[in-house]
Amino acid sequence: NNEMKFYDNDPDKDRAIKKMQIIEKVVKRMREVDPTRPICFDSNYKRPEKRFGKDFFKTFDDGDIDDDHSYINWYDHTVFKQFNGEFQKNKREGRPLISQEMSTGYPNNETGHPTTFYTYVHQNPQVLVGDDAYPYGDPNAFLEAHRFITAELAEALRRSNPEASGILHFALLTWFRNVYDANTIDPYPAYYSMQNSLSPLLVSAELWGRHLYAGSTLPVRFCVVNDLEDGSSVPASTITWSLISAG
């Protein structure tokens, strides 16, 4: 299931254990059905050793992997708190760590404005683009912000989390217009930026700021992430880079 969370949110520990035992039966049944695939106990499940203790999991089957859902640059904290391997600090020994729900917000599927619910209830979009979050604003403002924060998050996670086993970013309903019509579906800007950010061989600049001033010194660390499928090494290379003004 998706984000049941009773192992965290149910204040009655004994009742939470009974619920977990029900899911454990499903895990064991799935191992019989297909023993070749790793199992995630629950979407967004991270083994709660602090609550139940390590000894509890010596005899309890809670699957094979941990799955950390996060909304960095959206609900959660800024991407600048993901530059030093913070994501992989949630890794438990012997258990691969993934995220199958990494998201940075929701353009709607028609105009590209942020989805109305988030504008009026959570108010996340206003933090990024102010009044342009509303229906009378320019949708390109939000699409550009969404493109930028999605790509920078993907690169930050790849730069600093070699112990992580994979990140799945929200894509279909957030990177495309008209997703319900194969004849008119059209990529939003985030799609094109993520082509680069998720390329097998990534060259990424770690920038601790978003405001750059003429004449100032720009401290920057360049990282090369090599996920080439054939496992080949990257030969000695030279990075050529420049700053380009959109205005």
Where are these regions (language model features)?
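Proline/serine/threonine-rich low-complexity linkers at boundaries of modular beta-sandwich domains
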Residues: 188-203
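Beta-strand-rich binding/interaction modules
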Residues: 215-247
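Localized sequence-composition bias
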Residues: 175, 184, 190, 242-246
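Short glycine/serine/proline-enriched coil/turn segments at secondary-structure junctions
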Residues: 75, 89, 213-214, 231-233
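Substrate-binding/catalytic cleft of secreted carbohydrate-active enzymes
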Residues: 1-186
